[in-house]
Regions:
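Flexible mid-to-C-terminal extensions adjoining Fe-S/redox cofactors in radical SAM and related proteins
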Residues: 223-224, 228-261
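Short secondary-structure boundary/hinge segments and terminal tails
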Residues: 40, 113, 206, 234, ...
Length: 261
C-alpha cells in the first residue's frame, strides 16, 4: 500500500484534478475514486488518508457518506479533508469529521458544474476559468505542503444551519430535475461515453441512443463531457456554456484507482 491514500469523488474533474495536484507534492499516493463503491476500503497501512469531494446541495454527494463509513483508518494516521464548491463550504466536512476525526481540513472554490442551477462562472469570488484553474493548482501545492508538515486545524468544521436544511431537501430536488435529462438525437453520435461514465449505471442505450433512468446523483459528468453537447437538462442547460476541468478527461473519471509516485 502507498504511503498516502486520497479518496476522491469528482463529477466534472475539478476534485480529481485537485487530488492529483495534492498527490504530486505528497508523492507515493493512491487516489481511490468514490463515484461508486471504493475498490480499497482498508487504509490502515497508510500514513496519511485524505478525502476530496465537492459540495452537492449544501452537503455530501449522494451515497458518499456510506463510502466514507466503509473506509478503515489507523488511529495513528494523519487524516485530512478538502471540500470544493463554487461558493460556500456546506456540511460535507462537518459530516466527514463525525465519521473520521480530521487533523486538517480546508474549503476551496472552483468553477460551478451544476449547469441547471447556475452558469459555470457563478463562483465566489467570481474569476475567469483560467484564473480559477491556476489558483486551484497553486492552492493544492500550498495545502499539500501543509499536510506534509503535519499542520493541524484547531477548529472543527462548522455546520451551517441553512446548508443542513438544504442538504435534506436536495435529494427530492434531484429526483425532480433528473426527470428532465434528455438527449438531442439529431446531434448525438452514439459514442457510448455517457453510459460508461455514469457511476450509477443510470444510462442505457436503446436503439443506439442514451435513455436516462431514475438513479441520477447529479455528478453531471454525462452532460458536461458530452463531445457534441447533446445531453441537456431543461432549456437553461441548452443555452449555457458547458464546463469540465481542462486537465481531466472523461476516461480519467472512469478509473477506480490512480497511483502517483
Amino acid at each position: 500500500m502507498s504511503t498516502n491514500i486520497i479518496y476522491c469523488f469528482s463529477g466534472t474533474g475539478n476534485c480529481l484534478d485537485f487530488a492529483q495536484n495534492l498527490a504530486k507534492v505528497l508523492g507515493d499516493t493512491d487516489i481511490v475514486m468514490m463515484r461508486s463503491e471504493p475498490v480499497v476500503t482498508d487504509a490502515t497501512a497508510a500514513k496519511r488518508v485524505g478525502f476530496v469531494f465537492p459540495c452537492h446541495g449544501g452537503g455530501l454527494p449522494e451515497g458518499l457518506e456510506e463510502c466514507i463509513k466503509s473506509v478503515k483508518i489507523s488511529p495513528d494516521a494523519y487524516v485530512f479533508g478538502i471540500s470544493q464548491s463554487a461558493s460556500y463550504l456546506g456540511t460535507g466536512l462537518y459530516k466527514l469529521n463525525k465519521i473520521h476525526h480530521l487533523d486538517y481540513w480546508k474549503g476551496t472554490t472552483h468553477q460551478c458544474s451544476c449547469i441547471w442551477l447556475f452558469p459555470h462562472t457563478m463562483m465566489l469570488p467570481p474569476v475567469p476559468p483560467k484564473f480559477a484553474q491556476k489558483r486551484s493548482e497553486k492552492l493544492a501545492v500550498k495545502i499539500a505542503k501543509e499536510i506534509l508538515a503535519g499542520k493541524v486545524t484547531e477548529k472543527a468544521p462548522p455546520c451551517n444551519p441553512f446548508n443542513a436544511v438544504e442538504s435534506k431537501v436536495w435529494p427530492k430536488l434531484v429526483v425532480k430535475k433528473s426527470r428532465k435529462l434528455a438527449v438531442n438525437k439529431d446531434t448525438c453520435e452514439s459514442c457510448g461515453q455517457c453510459a460508461k461514465l455514469c457511476p450509477k449505471g443510470n444510462i442505457k442505450y436503446v436503439d443506439g441512443k442514451p435513455v436516462f433512468g431514475a438513479n441520477c446523483i447529479q455528478c453531471l459528468g454525462c452532460l458536461q463531457y458530452c463531445p457534441t453537447e447533446s445531453i441537456y437538462m431543461g432549456r437553461k442547460t441548452q443555452k449555457r456554456e458547458h464546463y469540465h476541468n481542462p486537465n481531466i478527461k472523461a476516461i480519467d473519471l472512469m478509473q477506480t484507482l490512480i497511483h502517483i509516485d
